[in-house]
């Protein structure tokens, strides 16, 4: 078989790349080792609950997200529709002491909040005049302590990074993990001053598509990947094994075993990988081991994700995006999302759906706990932290383990990015994509895919 462009991986990045290229008339083929398309995105429906076993939400942080939804609603016949969270979901909670407390959303609440010390509240007034950092590899924790103070690290930065990266603020490097924050200081000298100036910058109509709203799809995120996989049809091959890619003159040869055990070959002009870095040594054997080691130096946070549903909340109402738990509070969960407060149809009418996140880089051992042990944690948190009375118990508990859940953009990132660029220049037609670069969120994945497709059309 011959194709213009071969894409490895049928997750969000791979499907978005393939769909965009195919919609522009390019001949594409997608290879996927799993027996289903969608990658980590997987929506489940059970007993009145609609829950995710991978990503739960995204943010419309770039126009590409909005543009993709506009297209997919058309090609899916209305089956894929954007759903954004209500204003109530802007409320974010942080656990301190014995309860969840709202993260400040304005000057008044910032002054009154018990989350931060009085000293750090005064300290933040001087943030616009603090000296700009000089270490390009400064961690998020170091940067936040220097500009904001320890209590802001403990009760804002640390839980935020637990929620996004399941990571450690003292190892995540700011310019890779939070490049927008890094650029505020570097370009404007201050977070506060930079945010104010950015807000005043003129925006085009396309810029305004990036509303920053929390999003899903009506009925769940699988409707996004299903819309693209249905559009692509037999251009996706599932259940492949033993994939090897090798350069051959100005083209590429991919060999693999299909689900029936037959040996197959594809000849392509361009190859795009969208899989995790840990897969690359096997599928790109032509890259020297010393160079591949620099690409494959990426650490992933392990994660246990647990969907917890209750059919009748007995009047308890959580109108917020979710609650995050600082490391210093020594709880067994990193955070809890409230999907039924954000999106329609996620729980029965009188019920609620929660998503617990457990583990991360600081507590990788949680992945080894049995279902019984994790269920005990779920029930304890349900009563102690979510404040359900003892007579009310979860009606749904579904446990999902992810060994390689979230890439950690640590000090090794610079070497990895440089090596990826070097390999792409050395081997014409090779594109190494996926969440090993350019951001981990769904919006990052969509933008990377659209950018690659734009470059190849």
What are these model-predicted stretches?
Residues 13, 36, 278:
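Conserved Rossmann-like nucleotide-cofactor binding loop
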Residues 104-108, 318, 336-457:
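Conserved flavin/dinucleotide-binding core of flavoenzymes
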Residues 126-245, 251:
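Active-site/ligand-binding neighborhood in enzyme catalytic cores
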Residues 22-46:
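Glycine-rich FAD pyrophosphate-binding loop
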Residues 240-354, 361-367, 384-385:
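Mid-domain catalytic core of redox enzymes
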């Amino acid at each position: 078989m011959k194709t213009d462009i071969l894409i490895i991986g049928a997750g969000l990045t791979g499907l978005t790349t393939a769909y965009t290229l195919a919609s522009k008339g390019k001949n594409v083929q997608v290879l996927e080792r799993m027996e289903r398309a969608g990658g980590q995105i997987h929506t489940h429906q059970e007993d009145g609950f609609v829950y995710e076993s991978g990503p739960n939400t995204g943010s419309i942080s770039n126009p590409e997200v909005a543009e993709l939804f506009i297209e997919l609603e058309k090609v899916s016949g209305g089956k894929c529709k954007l759903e954004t969270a209500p204003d109530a979901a802007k409320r974010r909670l942080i656990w301190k002491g014995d309860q969840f407390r709202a993260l400040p959303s304005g000057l008044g609440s910032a002054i009154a909040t018990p989350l931060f010390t009085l000293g750090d509240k005064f300290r933040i007034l001087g943030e616009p005049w603090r000296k700009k950092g000089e270490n390009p590899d400064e961690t998020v924790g170091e940067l936040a302590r220097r500009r904001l103070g320890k209590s802001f690290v403990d009760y804002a930065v640390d839980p935020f990074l637990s929620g996004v990266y399941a990571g450690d603020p003292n190892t995540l490097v700011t310019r890779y993990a939070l490049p927008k924050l890094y650029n505020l200081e570097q370009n404007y000298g201050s977070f506060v001053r930079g945010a104010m100036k950015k807000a005043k910058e003129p925006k085009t109509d396309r810029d305004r598509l990036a509303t920053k709203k929390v999003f899903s799809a009506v009925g769940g995120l699988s409707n996004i990947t299903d819309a693209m996989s249905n559009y692509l049809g037999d251009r996706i091959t599932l259940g492949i094994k033993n994939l090897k890619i090798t350069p051959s003159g100005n083209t590429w040869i991919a060999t693999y075993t299909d689900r029936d055990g037959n040996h197959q070959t594809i000849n392509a002009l361009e190859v795009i990988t969208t899989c995790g870095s840990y897969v690359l040594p096997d599928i790109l054997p032509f890259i020297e081991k010393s160079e591949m080691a620099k690409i494959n130096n990426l650490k992933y946070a392990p994660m246990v994700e647990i969907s917890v549903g209750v059919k009748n909340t007995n009047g308890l109402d959580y109108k917020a995006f979710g609650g995050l738990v600082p490391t210093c509070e020594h709880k067994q969960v990193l955070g809890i999302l409230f999907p039924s407060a954000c999106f329609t149809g996620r729980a029965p009418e009188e019920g609620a759906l929660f998503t617990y996140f457990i583990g991360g880089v600081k507590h990788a051992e949680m992945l080894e706990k049995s279902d019984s042990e994790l269920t005990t944690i779920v029930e304890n948190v349900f009563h102690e932290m979510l404040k359900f009375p003892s007579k009310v118990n979860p009606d749904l508990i579904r446990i999902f383990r992810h060994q390689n859940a979230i890439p950690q953009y640590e000090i090794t990132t610079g070497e990895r990015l440089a090596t990826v660029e070097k390999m792409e220049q050395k081997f014409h037609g090779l594109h190494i994509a996926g969440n090993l670069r350019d951001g981990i969120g769904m919006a990052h994945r969509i933008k990377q895919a659209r950018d690659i497709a734009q470059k190849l059309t």
